[in-house]
């Protein structure tokens, strides 16, 4: 069912772990290593419902495809997410939504954005290289932050660095001077 990354072969154990997390005790009997959980046994304190497979909850791929379909309908024009969601998450969403709706194409276009990188690494709380929007706004204007991201390719890692902010400030000054000159010319 690898539709978005068809030539990548078997999923690695790391990819499957990333995509599924810890499977509940009742879901160890997979028929194929690449099978994904449609229903998971709940951990203590998690929401759970009765089902023919026991008490539990939907797997996260089902959660996402159902929420998207509920709001947007049986077919989506554009579906977006981080580049790390291409496989297995988005492929799994496709597999189940296309099977449910009996369609060949649940989504027309996927946009997979690059991650935010700080000090050369993907931003992550666990790496302690994390910054909140509020913290960024204490040092930079919303316009500077927007320009910083607009100056980078959307599908590649986005760099948050002193140089990237400096480039954005320079562009902001350039635009401000340009539009100031245009206004002066129009006033005549």
Task: Please name every model-derived segment.
Residues 1-185:
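Alpha-helical recognition segments enriched in aromatics with Gly/Pro capping
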């Amino acid at each position: 069912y690898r539709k978005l990354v068809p030539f990548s072969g078997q999923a690695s154990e790391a990819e499957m772990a990333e995509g599924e997390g810890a499977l509940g005790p009742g879901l160890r009997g997979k028929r194929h290593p690449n099978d994904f959980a449609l229903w998971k046994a709940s951990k203590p304190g998690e929401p759970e419902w009765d089902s023919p497979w026991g008490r539990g909850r939907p797997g996260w791929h089902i959660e996402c495809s159902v929420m998207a379909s509920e709001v947007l309908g049986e077919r989506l024009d554009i579906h977006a997410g981080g580049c790390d969601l291409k496989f297995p998450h988005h492929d799994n969403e496709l597999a189940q939504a296309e099977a449910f709706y009996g369609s060949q194409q649940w989504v027309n276009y996927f946009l997979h954005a690059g991650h935010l990188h700080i000090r050369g690494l993907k931003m992550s709380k666990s790496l302690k290289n994390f910054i909140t929007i509020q913290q960024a706004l204490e040092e930079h204007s919303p316009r500077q932050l927007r320009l910083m991201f607009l100056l980078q390719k959307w599908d590649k890692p986005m760099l948050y660095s002193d140089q990237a902010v400096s480039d954005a400030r320079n562009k902001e000054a350039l635009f401000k001077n340009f539009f100031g000159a245009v206004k002066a010319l129009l006033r005549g």
